[in-house]
Amino acid sequence: MPKYTEYFGNRKLPRGIRNNNPGNIRWGSPWQGLVKNGKLQDASFCLFTDAAYGIRAIAATLITYYDKRKAKDGSKIDSIREVIERWAPPNENNTSAYANQIGKVLNISPDSETLNLHDYRTMRALVEGIIRHECGDPKQYGVTPHNNVNEWYPDEVIDEGLRRAGLTKPVTTVAAVPATKTTAAAGGAVVV
C-alpha cells in the first residue's frame, strides 16, 4: 500500500492532518512511524511518516485504555463517554459534545457500557469519529471529502492503520453450496 502523505506539512490544513496525526496525539510514547526530529517542526504534537501510523497510534491508545486503564469511577473503560473523558479531558475539551458526536457515529448512547475495542467494526467507527471530531470538515479547507465517516482518508488508509494496531478487517465468507447436477452444470462438466 502506498504511503498516504498527501497532506503532510500543508499549513493550510488542520494540524492533525498536516502532521499525519489525525488524533492530535501529543509527544510522549515512542510510537512507530514517528518523523525523526519531528519535535523541531511541532513541539507539542507528534508527526508521523504517514497517516496510517497516526491512525495506528489512535487505535493502540484506545486499546490500552480498554485493557489497562480505569474510568473515573474505577470501572473498566467500556463506554464512549469513558473513552472520550480519557482521550479528550474536560479541562481542554467539551467532552459531552465530543461523546455525543461519537455516539451518533456508533449509533449507541455515549453512556452504554457495551464497547468492545477489540472488535474491528467498533474500533473503526470510533477512530473515524475521532478523526472527524479532531480535524473537522475537509470541505472547510477546500478538500474533496472521501465517502466515509472521517472524510479525510480513504478506507484503505483506515484499514492499514487498524491492521498496524493488530485489528484486521473481518473476512466475509459465503456459505458453501452443495454440489448437485444443477450447480455442477452451472460451473462446467458434471460427473454422473
Tell me the role of every PLM-derived stretch.
Residues 1-191:
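Cell-wall polysaccharide-cleaving catalytic domain and substrate-binding groove, primarily
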